């Protein structure tokens, strides 16, 4: 599937926020998966590199952090994100055919990719398993896209979410990808060590925009929105930014870790 999220300054900020939240809330899981100083890790579907930078900082110069994304603009952004870190890099490639060396990684991470690749989920996870060394781990993160909530809600922003989900359904994507993670790891021959809900649940900071807004141009091209919708949603975000007290937001995110059998 083509990349649908426009890499604006706001979208890059959203990626950085997600990466820092993940570092704060998933570090114990990462350590259990083998993401630590000196480890070789891969970030498949690395996007603009916010998480790749975090991983590179964790493994340090004694390790390696390699990112892959099919979108050239994302690869360029990721390369910039890890500039100055000689042990980190980003390259173009598909999630199911990365071009990375098989069996060479202590941990392979793939975040928010499977839900955008309906029908190819098992092919992707099987490839991730091949990239991990014997005894290595695959770390998956994805969401239940139907369970995104905000309170107090705004009917216009709820409409944006509904349109974005309809757009994904039309592309054949699986909105419940997060609930598949444990099953996918097992089907790929891995032993599931962790499978849990990770949220987030947080107060929505002013200026934060969801993935649906980043995909607005794609929604228009696909016939799911028009110029009037974009203006209506933009005004709704202006209201959201001024709201006091700040609304609460929840995304039903899931994390799973699968271990490749040791020899």
Q: Model-derived features: where do they sit?
A:
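A short acidic, Gly/Pro-enriched loop at the edge of an enzyme's catalytic core
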Residues: 98-108
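A short glycine-rich, Lys/Arg-flanked "PGG" loop and its adjoining helix->strand segment in the class I
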Residues: 122-137
């Amino acid at each position: 599937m083509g990349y649908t999220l426009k890499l604006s300054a706001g979208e890059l900020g959203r990626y950085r926020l997600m990466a820092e939240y993940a570092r704060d809330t998933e570090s114990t899981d990462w350590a259990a998966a083998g993401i630590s100083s000196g480890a070789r890790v891969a970030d498949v579907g690395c996007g603009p590199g916010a998480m790749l930078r975090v991983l590179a900082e964790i493994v340090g110069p004694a390790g390696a952090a390699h990112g892959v994304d099919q979108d050239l603009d994302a690869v360029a952004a990721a390369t910039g994100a890890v500039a100055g870190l000689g042990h980190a890099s980003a390259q173009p490639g598909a999630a199911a055919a990365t071009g990375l060396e098989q069996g060479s990684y202590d941990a392979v991470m793939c975040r928010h990719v499977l839900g955008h690749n309906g029908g190819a989920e098992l092919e992707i996870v099987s490839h991730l398993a091949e990239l991990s060394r014997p005894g290595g781990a695959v770390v998956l993160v994805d969401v239940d896209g139907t369970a995104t909530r905000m309170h107090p809600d705004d009917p216009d922003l709820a409409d944006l979410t509904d349109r974005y989900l309809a757009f994904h359904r039309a592309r054949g994507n699986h909105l419940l990808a997060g609930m598949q993670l444990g099953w996918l790891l097992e089907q790929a021959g891995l032993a599931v060590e962790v499978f849990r809900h990770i949220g987030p649940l947080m107060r929505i900071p002013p200026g934060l925009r969801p993935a649906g807004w980043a995909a607005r141009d794609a929604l228009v091209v696909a016939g799911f929105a028009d110029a009037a919708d974009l203006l209506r949603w933009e005004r709704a975000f202006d209201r959201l930014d001024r709201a006091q007290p700040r609304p609460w937001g929840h995304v039903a995110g899931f994390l799973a870790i699968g271990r490749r059998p040791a020899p």
